[in-house]
């Protein structure tokens, strides 16, 4: 059963990252990124299993229902790698706000214009990322580190929502309110 979007409302509000949060995010990410393929696949499989409507944007595997089959999909694995590389670029650039803005702008534009992805899925994906990383890396994802990640993902969601608004995304008022 799909969860309600209210479960990720904490991703609606962001504030600038502190220096301490930047360091915690970068340190924790270094551990996660060592297993980026497995982590990325776990995140996308969880997204598609818990939120099956998110598969509508992926013609290559939207028909696959079984989690094990999803894990084996080469197309899913490729997209998981792209997601993890985008997060890696973001995390590596946390000291450069222009680079962060550029990355988020490019991701937002590509998903709005080319892929026509409803922006609510960025909030949903962010919640899934927090959930999977917390389960897979419990020693790394302490409450304090998870809070820093929540703030980073809120920044991501707010920035991408702003890109969609700038582009005049037609469904924005219905999807992320």
From Swiss-Prot:
Catalytic reaction equation(s): Fe(II)-heme b-[protein] + nitric oxide + O2 = Fe(III)-heme b-[protein] + nitrate; Fe(III)-heme b-[protein] + nitric oxide + H2O = Fe(II)-heme b-[protein] + nitrite + 2 H(+); 2 superoxide + 2 H(+) = H2O2 + O2; H2O2 + AH2 = A + 2 H2O
Pfam families: Globin
Keyword line: Cytoplasm, Heme, Iron, Metal-binding, Nucleus, Oxidoreductase
Binding site for heme b: 79, 111
Molecular-function annotations in GO: heme binding; iron ion binding; nitric oxide dioxygenase activity, heme protein as donor; nitrite reductase activity; oxidoreductase activity; oxygen binding; superoxide dismutase activity
InterPro entries on file: Globin (IPR000971), Globin-like_sf (IPR009050), Globin/Proto (IPR012292), Globin_lamprey/hagfish (IPR013314)
Primary site of residence: cytoplasm
Location of the protein in the cell: Cytoplasm; Nucleus
GO biological process, alphabetically ordered: nitric oxide catabolic process; oxygen transport; removal of superoxide radicals
Recorded superkingdom: Eukaryota
Globin domain mapped to chain residues: 16-165
Entry GO CC: cytoplasm; nucleus
E.C. no: 1.14.12.-, 1.7.-.-, 1.11.1.-, 1.15.1.1
Quaternary data: Monomeric.
Similarity comment: Belongs to the globin family.
Role of this protein: Probable multifunctional globin with a hexacoordinated heme iron required for the catalysis of various reactions depending on redox condition of the cell as well as oxygen availability. Has a nitric oxide dioxygenase (NOD) activity and is most probably involved in cell-mediated and oxygen-dependent nitric oxide consumption. Under normoxic conditions functions as a nitric oxide dioxygenase (NOD) but under hypoxic conditions the globin may switch its function to that of a nitrite (NO2) reductase (NiR), generating nitric oxide.
Stated name of the protein: Cytoglobin-1
Organism: Oryzias latipes
């Amino acid at each position: 059963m799909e969860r309600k979007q209210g479960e990720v409302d904490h991703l609606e509000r962001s504030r600038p990252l502190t220096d301490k949060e930047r360091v915690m995010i970068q340190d924790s990410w270094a551990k996660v990124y060592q297993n980026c393929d497995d982590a990325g696949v776990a995140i996308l499989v969880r997204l598609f299993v818990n939120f099956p409507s998110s598969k509508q944007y992926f013609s290559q595997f939207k028909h696959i229902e079984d989690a094990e089959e999803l894990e084996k999909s080469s197309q899913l694995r490729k997209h998981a790698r792209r997601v993890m590389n985008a997060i890696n670029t973001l995390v590596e650039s946390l000291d450069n706000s222009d680079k962060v803005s550029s990355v988020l702008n490019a991701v937002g534009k590509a998903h709005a214009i080319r892929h026509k992805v409803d922006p609510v899925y960025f909030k949903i994906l962010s919640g899934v990322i927090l959930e999977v990383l917390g389960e897979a890396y419990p020693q790394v994802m302490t409450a304090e580190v998870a809070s820093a990640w929540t703030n980073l993902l809120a920044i991501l969601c707010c920035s991408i929502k702003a890109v969609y608004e700038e582009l005049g995304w037609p469904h924005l008022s219905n999807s992320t309110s």
